[in-house]
A protein has these predicted regions:
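Short, contiguous acidic/charged loop-to-helix segments that flank catalytic cores in large enzymes
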Residues: 59, 84-86, 129-135
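Conserved helicase ATPase core of P-loop NTP-dependent helicases/translocases
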Residues: 87-92
Length: 182
């Protein structure tokens, strides 16, 4: 993410001296459509609900409502986090959060779905800004906040075309064809 053309805060970035995170390599998972992406996401959450704290971080409340409904249909209760709540890192279960509300919190597994062009960055935010490059940089900073919430597993997903905010190549995460995981 910090290798994106839109990242403009290199002076604020502190590179780690060593990699201390445990768990699988971060993953960027591609799907053909939204339905496949949701099926995979719900399946992953169901598999780890009893053993880890899981958060799904979304761009907006409408997406949170959609995912809460999809999880509920599969018998999974998800708690919606607001920005004034305390951390949940040691509490097993499923949480839904916006980028803003996740700031300062940590979870064992972090899922960030719908990182496809058209959904992320938020087109309304970009189009209403006088300075589009600055608006894109702000959207990228929100994503950076979400990325840094994980203590163990970190999974990003999208369907269709990947957001322009991502660098065209990166060695920081593995790219996976999600259709093979269904």
């Amino acid at each position: 993410i910090t290798n994106s053309d839109y990242w403009d805060s290199k002076e604020d970035l502190i590179s780690p001296a060593e990699n201390i995170a445990e768990g699988p390599a971060p993953a960027l998972i591609e799907f053909k459509n939204e339905i496949s992406e949701i099926i995979w996401l719900v399946s992953q959450i169901k598999d780890s609900i009893d053993t880890m704290s899981n958060v799904i971080i979304c761009r907006n409340r409408a997406t949170i409502v959609l995912l809460r409904m999809k999880l509920s249909q599969k018998g999974v209760h998800a708690t919606i986090i607001d920005k004034d709540q305390a951390g949940f890192a040691s509490v097993k279960g499923v949480y839904l959060s916006t980028f803003h509300a996740a700031k300062g919190l940590e979870f064992e597994n972090v899922f960030i779905p719908f990182l496809n062009e058209g959904a992320y960055p938020d087109s309304e935010t970009i189009n209403s800004s006088a300075d589009q490059r600055s608006a894109l940089a702000s959207e990228l900073k929100l994503l950076y906040v979400a990325v840094t919430r994980s203590k163990y597993g970190f999974f990003m997903s999208y369907h269709g075309q990947l957001s322009r905010l991502f660098p065209s190549t990166s060695s920081n995460y593995q790219i996976i064809n999600g259709e093979t995981m269904l």
